[in-house]
Amino acid sequence: MKAIVKFAFQLGAKIALNPDFIVEKGGRYFLLNNALLKFARKNFYYAGAYLGKVKNGKFFPSFNLLAMLAKGEANKIVVEKKAAWLFICGRDIFRRGILAVRGSRKKGDHVLVLNEFGDCLGFGRIVRGLDEGAKNEVAVKNILDVGDFLRREK
């Protein structure tokens, strides 16, 4: 549970999850409801909403968790259509592709990346202050995007 809260903090978000509904199994975290909690005490592979996993001491969020964080207050950027497509293809975001910034603009901070419709596409790290630099310079380094799953398929 600490890993989830720490990750949310890195994005400038606060997340209020009832620890009674969070189940950890093999380093993977799941958010369950009352009905599922009865069954989850037994052996299970997947239940409820998958929130992410801890591997080698590092937390890897799920897109369920990113979508939850995107609904509230957090560091976010909204990108135009072409930048959104390039981002889900694994590319970084140039300043010229950013339409709006909410929250931190500081170098080194993490941001959620949203398309023009408010869909969370993933997250990245600000590599150059969002108020500085040329429009043709990388502003946000891609860390995780929704296209990752498809790129891993063989």
Predicted regions and their residues:
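Accessory RNA 3′-end/elbow-binding domains used by RNA modification enzymes
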Residues: 1-154
